[in-house]
């Protein structure tokens, strides 16, 4: 069942779920900062709203810089993930770059039915990310996947003399070229692969933080195996 449509009042701001009584004090909460970047109107805000609220924004509202916070359980351990929704407009480049340095994982987003947004991944977004944060993992995310086979969208692309939807093999090839953790396509409207996108982001961030702590020889830090942390993700 697709998510219900949210009014503007419902979708902004988001409220953080309250942890169950006693769970928060049982074990320390791991914090993860996840930043979404990409051209304007590719659906970054919709991804966050659909994932955290099980709803879909009623209308497009350009974002300057919004933050959202939710708690999830990863193999029974509490994890707080901060989702940073950034603007794609050039006049906000300086503001956007301020949130990059301490980011644990990036979602580089493009719309599968906007070839120009795909091109800008290598021309704008990856260079911008790496200028301010050379090490954090990056996931390449194709958004609006529900429109890939939409007849009206295909007609509009053809009439406008533009290219068709971005082919999946081409996107996968780019992910390998830029050394992204993976390439995933999803839809905020239907929620297809939506959870997989954020699960993968959380896993990549956890492994990245573990590697950094290991390099710093922090006492008591153990390497987190992929299979252990991938077993279970759920909202608290």
From Swiss-Prot:
Signal peptide: none annotated. Residues 1-27 are annotated as: Disordered. It is found in: Cell membrane; Endosome membrane. Gene3D superfamilies: P-loop containing nucleotide triphosphate hydrolases (3.40.50.300). Its main location: membrane. GTP binds at residues 38-45, 85-89, 143-146. CDD domains: Wrch_1. One of its GO terms (molecular function) is GTPase activity. One of its GO terms (cellular component) is endosome membrane. A lipid is attached at residue 234 (S-palmitoyl cysteine). The modification Phosphoserine is found at residue 25. Interacts with PAK2. Plays a role in the control of the actin cytoskeleton via activation of the JNK pathway. NCBIfam families: small_GTP. Belongs to the small GTPase superfamily. Rho family. This is Rho-related GTP-binding protein RhoV.
